[in-house]
Amino acid sequence: MTVDPLIQSLKGKLVVSVQAYMGEPLRTPETMAQMSRACELGGAAIRCQGLADIAAIKGRCEVPVIGLWKDGHEGVYITPTLRHARACVAAGADIVAIDATDRPRPDGKSVEDTFRPLHEEGVLLMADCATIEDIRRAVDMGFDLVSTTLSHGVAAIDCTMADGPDLPLL
């Protein structure tokens, strides 16, 4: 199996999630870009949320940018559809993170139906997973990276970490 050079460049590297939400004091694309630049100077790659942030960060940083689009707060909300993923690519994401759980997606498609066309288009994809089964399925499908982003069970419901991470999975 050949590993994409961009994916290889992340091996052993810290990836910092640079995200702020509506109503938070740092919530501007320019601030996210400045924070990302500081992370880049420290040697980290970036994971960010939202089309404006992806574009602003790509305009300021040279490290790989993992982009995603959070739509809502319940169910599958991390880059939930093909349309969301393609918009992240258009905004400049080097890698697109999508929810790779087997939960129902808002467009009624399976994760495989979302993954396949993107993979065929050459989009590098990160699988955001909740369980070891999600990880195995993502690897079998051919995702470029996997993440345990959704492993803190509550995240699938309301975006909190009240129960903490699933340490055995990690």
Task: Spell out what each predicted region is.
Residues 89, 98-99:
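Extended substrate/RNA-proximal surfaces in nucleic-acid metabolism proteins
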Residues 26-29, 47-66, 75-83, 100-118, ...:
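Active-site-adjacent beta->alpha loops and helix N-cap segments on the catalytic face
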Residues 61-65, 91-95, 119-122, 140-147, ...:
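Glycine-enriched alpha-helix->loop->beta-strand junction motifs that scaffold or abut catalytic
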Residues 15, 45-49, 66, 97, ...:
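Conserved beta-strand positions in the central sheet of alpha/beta enzyme cores
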Residues 35-42, 96, 117-122:
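Short, surface-exposed connector motifs at secondary-structure boundaries
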Residues 1-90, 138-140:
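Conserved N-terminal beta1-alpha1 strand-loop-helix module at the mouth
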